[in-house]
Each structure stands twice: as C-alpha cells, then as structure tokens.
Amino acid sequence: MDGEEVAALIIDNGSGMCKAGFAGDDAPRAVFPSLVGRPRHQGIMVGMGQKDSYVGDEAQSKRGILTLRYPIEHGIVSNWDDMEKIWHHTFYNELRVAPEEHPVLLTEAPMNPKSNREKMTQIMFETFNVPAFYVSIQAVLSLYSSGRTTGIVLDSGDGVTHVVPIYAGFSLPHGILRIDLAGRDLTNHLSKILSERGYSFTTSAEREIVRDIKERLCYVALDFEQEMQTSSQSSAIEKSYELPDGQVITIGNERFRAPEALFRPADLGLEAAGIDQTTFNSIMKCDMDVRKELYGNIVMSGGTTMFPGIAERMQKEITALAPSSMKVKIIAPPERKYSVWIGGSILASLSTFQQMWISKQEYDESGPSIVHHKCF
C-alpha cells in the first residue's frame, strides 16, 4: 500500500445522501442525494442527448421533469438496479476513480438482512471488480469517529433512526432498536402542518423545498408546552422564507412542532416510543454492568440530530428517565452529519485494519457468504 494511488474508498450510502471519499481524508469529497430520476415524459427535444436516468444532484436539478426514486428505504437497499447506478456514479463521476484499483469500504444499517450484505459484496466484486472490500455498521463508525469504543449511538438520518449500544468496539445486537421515523418523515410532517397554514407542497420536487425549510429553520424546544404557549403570545419565533418563485411564507410554531415528532411519534400517528425513551429502553436491554458507561457516552450522529436544541432536550429527558444518581452525558460532535463517513476513513487508515479486508481472491474462493465471516 504506497501512498495516495491506492487509498481505500469510503462510501456511506444513506437513505437521503451518499457520502463518498478517500480513507485518510477528514471529510467526504462527494456528498450528493441518493436518488435516481427517470424522465416523466418521452423526449421531444431531438438531439438533446436525453439520458434514460439521472443520479444525485443532476436528478435533483432536473426534478421538474423527472420521477425521483430513493433506492435506499429506511436505511436498507430496496432497489438494486438503482443502487448500482448510484455506485457507478460515485466511482466514475464523483470520485473519478477506477474501482478495480481501490479497496472499497461500504457502510450498512444495523440489522441489515444477510442477503443484502451478500448482494453488496457480490456487486462490488463482480460488477465493479474491486480488489478488496469491507462492510461496517454505520453506528459503530460514528462511535469510532468520536474517539470512543464504548457508548450508545443515536444515529438518525433521512430514512431510519437506530439506537445502537456498543461495548469495546462490538455492537450488542440484543440492545439495538430501530425507529422508522427520521428526516424524511419530519419533512412530510412539516409539509402537512404547513398545508394547515394554506401552503401546499405536493410534488416530489416541492417536497425538497420543505426539506430546505426544515434544515434552515426548525429547532427542538426544551419544553414543548412552554414553547407553544410562548409562541401563541408573541411573534418572536416567526421567520420568513422565500420560495423559488419569489413568494415569501411565514413559519412560526411549525419550526419546533415538526421535530417534536422525534420525541412524540404519536404526532405522526406512529405507536413507536420517542428517541429519548428508545435510547433508555436500549440501555435497559444491556447488562447492568455496562449501563453506567452507556449513560455517560450517548453519542448523536446523522443529519436528523442537527436540529439546534436537540442535545439539551435529550439530556433533560434521559436524566428524568435514568436513576437519580446517574451521570448522563450527551455527545453531539459538530461534524456529526458526516461522522459515519469519518469513522470509516479512520478505520480504513489503521495499519491493524489492513488484514481485515476481504480480498478478491478470498471472494473467488468462498463466494458472497464470506462477508459474514470477515465483517462483523
């Protein structure tokens, strides 16, 4: 392994965004939407060089004429043809590398089905001909990037939220909990409450505008009831937002009502427990001896943990649930949007990791199932 030319590639395929780059870098080189768009209408502009599909930002910018699909739902790949297009785009258009020259580290959701891990492995070796491959659980990588090997990770992205307890670098499967409530649901919820104000966002393209409103203006209230009361008496929290067509809309208590669903999934009609209760439940599923270390190392990761106020609220709620003498610490690193990717970059750069890769030779001898023996 000499220098830059054989740097490993780290690809973190999220439900909403794909983060890709080179091991050893401190941030991903490419971050683009995990979406594939296909034209809604037959091409009428002859000679326009219309493609039959577009990926990422290009799909996003042409969204008015395309049908957009996200091949990763709730963190799990559900459409392999589209997924292959995203990987192809990552290698050739975003990173501009030949995949057959670089080891590739992919990330996966906790509890990813076995057949999915095998399929990922197979596509990497057979379609892209990579020389070496590894797959890592996203939450474990987030913990590494925070400089810990023990802790409990609340990883909330666009498609799924997981709570994953980790001890000495190994995830504790009996304590892993998943909530099918994440950024995309909050965006939909915000659309719904904005429509009560008379603003309508219906198409997949308009949904992206709502996502932008959410990312710029939403926050988590420390005390929801109190905040509702305050906002009804004053307009201090009102903000205006200019739509692409120049229309300006005003958004008030929607700013904190949308993300409140993370703590009260019932707002979305879901029976799940909130992120606070789920984190507590996960800790309680773990051995008594490790709980103290978990309470003291609650690490937030993923774009949906980026709301201002979320760490303080979490601290308050978990402290109320935990035994009274327990020291509760929430770690919310500023780079947590990319902490899964950063953890992958760190892991693949370790000298001790180099013998962990699945080589092409091993794959040719054992087939896709080797992933279960070498990646855990």
Curated annotation (Swiss-Prot):
It catalyses: ATP + H2O = ADP + phosphate + H(+). It is found in: Cytoplasm, Cytoskeleton. InterPro entries: Actin, Actin/actin-like_CS, Actin_CS, ATPase_NBD. The keyword ATP-binding applies. GO terms for molecular function: ATP binding; hydrolase activity. It comes from the Eukaryota. Its EC number is 3.6.4.-. Its main location: cytoplasm. Transmembrane segments: none annotated. Belongs to the actin family. This is Actin. It comes from Candida albicans. The gene is ACT1.
